[in-house]
Amino acid sequence: MNKIILVALITLSVSAVRAQQGNFQQPSVEDRVKNVHQKLDSAFKLEPSKLAKADTAFAVYYRGTDKLRQDLMSGGERPDMQVMREKMQPLTDTRDKELQTILTPEQYESWKKEVEPLLNQRRGGRPRQ
């Protein structure tokens, strides 16, 4: 019994320490596109050709945001979030225009209100600012 409690406490301690380290690794572009693909497919049941177009739009968007984020952080310090948001806005606008050609107006409205906020949540369930 004591061994079980000891193992449980050690496991809990290690988990708590790892959670606080902040070594967050961004998922790959392919993993993020796959996540969006699943959400779009389950929400709208799109044709395969439309899903492929959406996958391409999101791959371009994620590669662009990754490059921009890398460029902004290459200075060694954390960039201002407002500046980062402003520089990413053209990428978001391009992605959204592409989505508007893929989705119906009703689907796009549903995407903006229901699906996109789920993608923008951080770990722990907090939406991004």
Residue ranges and their predicted role:
Residues 1-25:
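Bacterial Sec-dependent N-terminal signal peptides
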Residues 20-129:
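Charge-rich (acidic/polar
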